[in-house]
């Protein structure tokens, strides 16, 4: 029987050992991910500030509170887009996405708004086939880290880790995606928690709906 990790209930002690019940373990970030221009600590701080400001982790409510208009469109392939038009910010979402994927795309686009608004303004916005591949674009990894930090609270994540849950169990319990769970582990590792770094797909937002 695998030994379960013990996470203090207060979660203030960062000497946490993650049990090897996770499905796949890696020691490095996926090859090809370019160095971030926004540090993980800055992303975590920005995401936490927005959650505190809006009082919610719901991406639609966050978008509304931040003055971003969310519009649904029958895209053929792309999942979403972020644009700044005449200083007005827009998020476009494919109108037939699975609810979990819809939330992930919304959170991802909110990450671009929070972290990359200036770049988006310069290039006329971001589209799915340009932005959802972390292997080719450093901003994608940053936006996905932001999405993981917004959607998954430290407390919920660590409580499930204490129970010995693996990535799939955590994702299922928190109505999330295993890749966001792995990215959440990255953010906690950066804060000093001794978790085993988890493998995640560099283009996970490309899967169907």
Predicted features by range, described:
Residues 1-209:
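Active-site hotspot residues in diverse enzymes, especially metal/ion-binding acidic/histidine motifs
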